[in-house]
Amino acid sequence: MAETMKDITMKNDESQEEEIPDQFLCCVCLELLYKPIVLSCGHLSCFWCVHKSMNGFRESHCPICRDPYVHFPSVCQKLYFLLKKMYPLAHKKREEQVLKEEQERECFSPQIDLVLDLSVCSGDSLNVSDKQKVEECSNAANLLSSSSSRGDIPCIPKNQEPTDAKALNVHENELLKDNKVSKQISKDDLLCSACKELLVRPVVLNCGHVYCEGCVVDMAEESEKIKCQECNVCDPRGFPKVCLILEQLLEENFPEEYNSRSSKVQKTLAHNSKGNIQSYLKEGPSLSNDNNNDDPWLANPGSNVHFGAGCDSCGVYPIIGDRYRCKDCKEEIGYDLCKDCYETPSKVPGRFNQQHTPDHRLELARSPQVLINFNSIGILLGPVISNEGMDTDEGEEGPPGSSNESSSTE
């Protein structure tokens, strides 16, 4: 009984100390955004909430604005660490909750703290200056590196915390002791990945890195493609929209500097000479080549569509065309690439914490004959025909391992 009362007190203390604004609550699970994903429309949801709501047979839709999308973006690490810093208690609770669910499914989201860049660990943005804390982060990163080089798969068994959580527990506890300091947002938390200045009209690329809108326009003008300067991966979606929640955070915490920089960026955009960029800014890219049929592959049984299979690099889901599957990744969920990502390899890790390395072998996978294998064609087409109310995406995907053709972004 004593322990129960203690738990209740802790929950009450948490609610009093950390009142989380609505904008930082996931629109799907209504809890603190955990490992936030920013869609091309600029709206946010948790990693697993986006994954579960995606459709394995057709394009998916944002639960807020119904904007269509076909790519499962990477976690926005800048926003992840910002929320962890602002709401450490709620974030820790969400971490434990999600980890328990992942252990039950034996399928894990990216372990962000393990691959944390030392520049982030030791910077002022996390208020960490103690050498010991930097060494803890370094040891965690070295552990992942050594495991990968030996070919070991650092899977997380049930009833056991991930290595990164153990390594950073001391760091988290010390942050909680000085809650006021840990919640302070510094300018370093919100710098553009290109100009290294305070973000203005922030946009989040498919890879999860954050830029000023004007900096992304400059990228597109130079190469007609938006190529991230941090990971060198091209955004396959066209021009993303401004993340309004991040913009609001910037305006509230740095009003003078933000307004000053914003006026300069707007002048740059107004004098932009590329008409196609202005078109992207207003309308966004088109997801379908056929305006009369959003799902042309459903009408053609011979279409090379890998239903329920997604690319672990660009996140396209489902994969249309050639699909390459790793023969050496041991995780049950597997590791897949679309043709474009196979031909332009990158160092982007698997979206589900797979320990894929460049020396792994990939083979061409055949697309399943879904229309033939289904007992009733209505099972496949039913959700596509019904577009009323909330998207029926989440009910169409089975748990990892439910099919031999299950994918890393199923």
From Swiss-Prot:
EC number(s) per UniProt?
2.3.2.27
* Stretches for region Disordered: 385-410
Chief subcellular location: cytoplasm
Record pathway: Protein modification; protein ubiquitination
Biased-composition ranges for Low complexity? 399-410
Under catalytic activity, the entry for this protein gives: S-ubiquitinyl-[E2 ubiquitin-conjugating enzyme]-L-cysteine + [acceptor protein]-L-lysine = [E2 ubiquitin-conjugating enzyme]-L-cysteine + N(6)-ubiquitinyl-[acceptor protein]-L-lysine
Gene Ontology annotations for the cellular component aspect, listed alphabetically:
cytoplasm
Pfam family name, one: zf-C3HC4_3
Broad enzyme group: transferase
Q: Where does Zn(2+) 1 bind?
A: 311, 314, 338, 341
Annotated binding of Zn(2+) 2, by residue: 326, 329, 356, 360
GO molecular function terms here? ubiquitin protein ligase activity; zinc ion binding
Q: What does this protein do?
A: E3 ubiquitin-protein ligase that mediates ubiquitination and subsequent proteasomal degradation of target proteins. Functions in the N-end rule pathway of protein degradation, where it specifically recognizes and ubiquitinates proteins with a N-terminal bulky aromatic amino acid (Phe). Does not act on aliphatic hydrophobic and basic N-terminal residues (Arg or Leu) containing proteins.
Full protein name = E3 ubiquitin-protein ligase PRT1
Naturally occurring in which organism (per UniProt): Arabidopsis thaliana
